[in-house]
């Protein structure tokens, strides 16, 4: 009868199991013999007789028997064949000297034995020469990865000074699991590991065979960031021709003009407040508390559209003189003449292309090193570095789903709230929706119709209509206005919800732009009252004031008679609150949170280029809207004087940060080059290589919004943001209008993610852009010190803290070096560069 197939399989399984168990037993027993012999040698370092000679003799006989049967011990074990009288390692009597049993080492003539394992090139113990520090290495308590750096092994040399010759087998090496300590007399200076070279302390563990797992991941964390060397580009400065020298002198003149115009604080913020411990600043528990300060002796009056400040009523000397309109427009025309010169355009284009290629070469040589440097910074990645939304309008700060949920909740919870006065009748919220033939059930995102679509491209008027939910201006007035029948309570509540979302994210900040129209002087007090009464304060938020350029509309409506009326309505209350804070207490505390002033409207509208001799604001009584640069000058001049006055009284200052270069003429960018700290958009710089190069040299901030531009003026793939970034312009990403543009709860992260996906930005690129956004923002010196490092105001790697920014010193040093080289090129080797970044 033939055996059953299952019986054959069972027999084969039993035989294989028996062989496996036997092999394991022999392997385990041989290993134990080696380990016990090592312990005995350690316990008797001076050659004393072992305590149990019978046991030693029996072990030697077993070892000889094993070697006779199997030839040689397994490759995974150190060679431990008995020493014989004839010097051989096979049979014969066990060799003794003074009663001691010796263990044979691998003959020196044989090559090293390599037994590769996963993630390792070789197994320790194959050679009698090894680095002492590699016997037992600290590893992370969360990972079995050894701390020896894979990159240290490349950098360290194989000199004899770094090597230790171990005679025979070292029991401490065999006990790699930490049961036995390292011998105290074995090169203590090499075994000891300086604590300063470790980022964290780690527990010691390992496996029995001394085979360490792959060390790469943990090594990256153990290494101090930025210890790796990188390839520095060394491109010698070109010797300019005579034509290039003249072009460089023109660029120098433009940069010096800007220095004369832009407001700079007399005492830098880091000199006023020295931050020794950049820990989390204490939250402001009473942001709207007002303490009487009294009125100063200053006196001011408006002359030709610009406020002049005097020490007292009898004084005639202007305390804070500013360039007049004629001088400004003359200098503006000089800049326009420079940017139109053909030879200068050619030179600047060539320099910009060279900047781009230098960065590409830097990435080819150092991208991997930047990546590893980022990995070495514990805790930090793109998600938990500070990012500031440097350009976002408050009326569109929420996404469409958020607004829809809020409207539905109010319609459900407060249907009988009187919300609007229309056509001589007060209407409740329910009556408003009934008049629109809508119910809460009918509402959805599509019906809300606030999202920009194809119809808004090159149609700024249609884009503005998207601020009306369901196409109804009455819903905009109820939910998105602060000066309405309910004193903006609904807008205040949804604003608080947005603040709460920002605070929950912790690492996202915003600078919200809120409108002052200039129709009446009481607008400032109304806005400040709305902010204070609704307790709209967050450590993650500051405010900018935006002025819509709508003079022609107000003139047609009969609200104003001249442009001077708008300037009076905007700036007179600010000077009053500065000279006498008690006269406008709510405005005074609100201005502590205002960091910038913006100009907004459709830049694509045609306008006349201003001449050197323009009418004064009081003389501007025609129905046409003044040119963009006309608005810019008078806002700049009044803000300059206001900031000088506020600085003299120890108050916060307000920078000019308008929309510019989104569309329209290149003149807009020339005017903002002379007067502004940073701008929003700036995509038209792609049309002027000279202005683009000047913006690079001056490091003027550009808060760019590619998704917003994609809906209005420029397709996403044509946006110049990636080119600007490669060339080294000071760019940041912003959202502009989340209500119309974005779809997620975190619009700023959405902006970053789309840019990273489309333009293949690396993690280092994203963190550099986020760092730029903090520099451009108007947050306090204390907060910036906490967010990006206490020395953030210093140039180059000295001002970078990778543990806070996650930007490698390699990238920062490259940017700083290239910028300094360009400045020396433009100034013909005579540039005077400050060690501090101009705020």
Curated annotation (Swiss-Prot):
The active site is at 681 (proton acceptor). It catalyses: AMP + H2O + H(+) = IMP + NH4(+). One of its GO terms (molecular function) is metal ion binding. Activated by ATP. Activated by sulfate ions (in vitro). Inhibited by phosphate ions. Changing residue 598 to N: In fac1-1; zygote-lethal phenotype. Its cofactor is Zn(2+). Its EC number is 3.5.4.6. Pfam families: AMP_deaminase (PF19326). Substrate binds at residues 393, 462-467, 662, 737-740. ATP binds at residues 289-296. Residues 85-94 have a biased composition (Gly residues). The modification Phosphoserine is found at residues 134, 140, 203. Pathway: Purine metabolism; IMP biosynthesis via salvage pathway; IMP from AMP: step 1/1. Binds 1 zinc ion per subunit. It comes from the Eukaryota. Residues 40-167 are annotated as: Disordered. GO terms for biological process: embryo development ending in seed dormancy; IMP salvage. PANTHER family: AMP DEAMINASE. NCBIfam families: AMP_deaminase. This is AMP deaminase. It comes from Arabidopsis thaliana.
């Amino acid at each position: 009868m033939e055996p059953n197939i299952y019986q054959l399989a069972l027999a084969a399984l039993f035989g294989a199991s028996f062989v496996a168990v036997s092999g394991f037993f022999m392997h385990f027993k041989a290993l134990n013999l080696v380990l016990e012999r090592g312990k005995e040698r350690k316990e008797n370092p001076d050659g004393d007789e072992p305590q149990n000679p019978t046991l030693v003799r029996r072990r030697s006989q077993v070892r000889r028997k094993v070697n006779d049967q199997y030839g040689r011990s397994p490759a995974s074990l150190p060679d431990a064949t008995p020493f014989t009288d004839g010097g051989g390692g096979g049979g014969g009597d066990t060799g003794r000297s003074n009663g001691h049993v010796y263990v044979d080492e691998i003959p020196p003539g044989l090559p090293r034995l390599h037994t590769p394992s996963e993630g390792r090139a070789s197994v320790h113990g194959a050679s009698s020469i090894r680095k002492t520090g590699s016997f037992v290495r600290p590893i992370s308590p969360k990972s079995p990865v050894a701390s020896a750096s894979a990159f240290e092994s490349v950098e360290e040399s194989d000199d004899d000074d770094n090597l230790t010759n171990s005679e025979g087998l070292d029991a401490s090496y065999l006990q790699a699991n930490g049961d036995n300590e390292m011998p105290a007399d074995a090169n203590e200076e090499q075994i000891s590991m300086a604590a300063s070279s470790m980022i964290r302390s780690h527990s010691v563990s390992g496996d029995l065979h001394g085979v360490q797992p792959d060390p790469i991941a943990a090594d990256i964390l153990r290494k101090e960031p930025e210890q790796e060397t990188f390839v520095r580009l060394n491109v010698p400065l070109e010797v300019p021709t005579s034509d290039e020298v003249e072009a460089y002198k023109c660029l120098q003149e433009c940069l010096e003009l800007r220095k004369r115009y832009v407001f700079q604080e007399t005492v830098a913020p880091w000199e006023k407040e020295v931050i020794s411990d950049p820990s989390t600043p204490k939250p402001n528990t009473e942001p709207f508390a007002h303490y009487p300060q009294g009125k100063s002796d200053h006196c001011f009056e408006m002359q030709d559209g610009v406020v002049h400040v005097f020490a007292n009523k009898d004084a005639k000397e202007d305390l804070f003189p500013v360039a007049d309109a004629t001088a400004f427009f003359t200098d503006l025309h000089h800049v326009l003449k420079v940017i139109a010169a053909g030879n200068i355009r050619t030179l600047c284009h060539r320099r910009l292309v060279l900047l781009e290629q230098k960065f590409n070469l830097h990435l080819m040589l150092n991208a991997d090193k930047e990546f590893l440097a980022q990995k070495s910074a514990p805790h930090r990645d793109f998600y938990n570095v500070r990012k500031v939304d440097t350009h976002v309008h408050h009326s569109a700060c929420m996404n469409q789903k958020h607004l829809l949920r809020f409207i539905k909740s109010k319609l459900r919870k407060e249907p009988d709230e009187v919300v609007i006065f229309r056509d001589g009748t007060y209407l409740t919220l329910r009556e408003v929706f009934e008049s629109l033939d809508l119910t809460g059930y009918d509402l959805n995102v599509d019906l809300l119709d606030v999202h920009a679509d194809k119809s808004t491209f090159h149609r700024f008027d249609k884009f503005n209509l998207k601020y009306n939910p369901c196409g109804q201006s009455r819903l905009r007035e109820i939910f998105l206005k602060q000066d309405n029948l309910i004193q903006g309570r609904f807008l205040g509540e949804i604003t608080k919800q947005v603040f709460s979302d920002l605070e929950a994210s912790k690492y996202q900040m915003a600078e919200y732009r809120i409108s002052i129209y200039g129709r009446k002087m009481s607008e400032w007090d109304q806005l400040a009252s709305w902010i204070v009464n609704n307790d709209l304060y967050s450590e993650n938020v500051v405010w900018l004031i935006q002025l819509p350029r709508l003079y022609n509309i107000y003139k047609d409506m009969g609200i104003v008679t001249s442009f001077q009326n708008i300037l009076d309505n905007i700036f007179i209350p600010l000077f009053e609150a500065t000279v006498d804070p008690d006269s406008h207490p709510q405005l005074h505390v609100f201005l502590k949170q205002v960091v910038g002033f913006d100009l907004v409207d459709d830049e694509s509208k045609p306008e006349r280029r201003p001449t050197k001799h323009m009418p004064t604001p009081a003389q501007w009584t025609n129905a046409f809207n003044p040119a963009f640069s006309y608005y810019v000058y008078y806002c700049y001049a009044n803000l300059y004087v206001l900031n000088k006055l506020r600085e003299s009284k120890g108050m916060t200052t307000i920078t000019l940060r308008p929309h510019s270069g989104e569309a329209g003429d290149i003149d807009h960018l020339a005017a903002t080059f002379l007067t502004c700290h940073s701008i929003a958009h700036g995509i038209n710089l792609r049309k002027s290589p000279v202005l683009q190069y000047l913006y690079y040299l001056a490091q003027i901030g550009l808060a760019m919004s590619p998704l917003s531009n994609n809906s209005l003026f420029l397709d996403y793939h044509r946006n110049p943001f990636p080119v600007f970034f490669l060339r080294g312009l000071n760019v940041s990403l912003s959202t502009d209008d989340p209500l119309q543009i974005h779809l997620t709860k975190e619009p700023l992260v959405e902006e970053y993610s789309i840019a990273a996906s489309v333009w293949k930005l690396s993690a280092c690129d994203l963190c550099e852009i986020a760092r730029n956004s903090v520099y451009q923002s108007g947050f306090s010196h204390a907060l910036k010190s906490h967010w990006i490092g206490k020395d953030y105001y210093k140039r180059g790697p000295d001002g970078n803290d990778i543990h806070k920014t996650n930007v490698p010193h390699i990238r920062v040093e490259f940017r700083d070096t290239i910028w300094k080289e360009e400045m020396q090129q433009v100034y013909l080797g005579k540039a005077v560069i400050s060690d501090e970044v101009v705020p």
